[in-house]
């Protein structure tokens, strides 16, 4: 019975943090014969949203060689069942651990190290525990951004519903924090055909859900530059798939730390950007936070590092690229 509960909890968590695989090309679902598509159809599908110009600056603030952007998707109860309408007390208690124990532990470490981070909230995660905003904002160096309404599968929604939920989320976060979020990270890191238009229409500064590069870049929609900064993510640089594989075994925090250190060292060598995504309810456990502690220690020892929020990075690369003119 205990094993079954563990498997259920792990499956819910991993499913919530895995990439959505929907690829609907018709109103009735995925086209079963894409090999028969015309060249125009293939190019149109691929070019909906594409990576445009590289926005990696010649150097980062203070002459730093590499930018380090730490982010936390504060999903809590939303991925522990709420977004699917599943009410199961055990998984929901794991979500509460995120706000009750893990987030304060993470912020305490960051504040002690003087390292800023960006916290992406599904609005309901913040509404259920608004005291999280006070914990994050106490130092004045962190950012709170938006990660949907209830970690909904935005790529499966019609345009009016997707926009309504994002507007609700932005307004709710602003009401709780006193500041309108300027950054967006799509739930499950996926776009609908309408997501980019909605994000642009709502005046957000940057987006951080896509994976076309290791460096910041400008998003292009149907071949047209949009002026939207993309700060790309990557599943290798996400704690969820590394700490929570499909099954009932867990990765060693020190093994995970080594993956991140190797990624950072290569980013440092290339002079680009290291963007890491974590979740308080995953990495905020006592045995796992050692991975973040060790990573920060390694990065500081390496030198030539600029630690910034996603907002600060987006503003900087826009300025360096002349996008504010």
Model-derived regions: residue spans:
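Metal-dependent polysaccharide deacetylase catalytic core of the NodB/CE4 family, i.e.
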Residues: 104-107, 111-192, 226-228, 232-247, ...
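C-terminal domain-boundary segment and adjacent tail
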Residues: 206, 218, 254-325
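Generic enzyme active-site microenvironment
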Residues: 71, 145, 307-310
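Active-site-adjacent pocket scaffolds in enzyme catalytic domains
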Residues: 30-61, 171-175, 179-270
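Active-site beta->alpha N-cap acidic-glycine motif
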Residues: 33-141, 150, 258, 265, ...
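Bacterial N-terminal signal peptides that target proteins for export
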Residues: 1-6
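C-terminal motif of bacterial Sec signal peptides marking the signal peptidase cleavage site
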Residues: 14-16
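Bacterial lipoprotein signal-peptidase II cleavage site
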Residues: 18-25
């Amino acid at each position: 019975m205990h094993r079954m509960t563990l498997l259920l909890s792990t499956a819910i968590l991993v499913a919530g943090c895995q990439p959505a695989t929907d690829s609907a090309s018709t109103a009735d679902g995925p086209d079963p014969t894409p090999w028969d598509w015309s060249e125009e159809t293939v190019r149109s599908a691929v070019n909906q949203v594409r990576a445009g110009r590289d926005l990696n600056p010649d150097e980062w603030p203070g002459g730093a060689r590499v930018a380090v952007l730490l982010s936390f998707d504060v999903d809590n109860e939303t991925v522990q069942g709420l977004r699917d309408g599943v009410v199961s007390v055990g998984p929901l208690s794991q979500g509460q651990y995120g706000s009750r124990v893990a987030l304060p532990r993470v912020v305490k470490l960051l504040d002690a190290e003087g390292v800023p981070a960006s916290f992406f909230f599904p609005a309901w995660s913040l509404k259920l525990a608004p005291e999280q905003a006070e914990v994050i904002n106490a130092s004045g160096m962190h950012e709170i951004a938006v990660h949907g309404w209830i970690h909904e599968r935005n790529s499966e929604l019609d345009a009016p519903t997707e926009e309504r939920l994002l507007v609700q989320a932005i307004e709710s976060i602003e009401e709780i924090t006193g500041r309108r979020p300027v950054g967006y990270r799509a739930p499950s890191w996926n776009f609908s055909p309408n997501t980019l238009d909605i994000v642009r229409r709502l005046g957000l500064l940057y987006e951080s859900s896509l994976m076309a590069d290791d460096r910041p870049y400008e998003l292009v929609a149907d071949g047209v530059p949009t002026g939207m900064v993309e700060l790309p993510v990557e599943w290798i640089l996400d704690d969820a798939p590394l700490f929570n594989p499909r099954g009932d075994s867990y990765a060693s925090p020190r093994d995970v730390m080594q993956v991140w250190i190797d990624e950072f060292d290569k980013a440092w060598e290339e002079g680009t950007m290291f963007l890491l995504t974590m979740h308080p309810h995953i990495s905020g456990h006592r045995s796992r936070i050692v991975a973040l502690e060790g990573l920060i220690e390694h990065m500081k020892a390496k030198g030539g590092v600029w630690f910034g929020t996603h907002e600060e990075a987006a503003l900087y690369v826009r300025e360096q690229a002349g996008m504010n003119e």
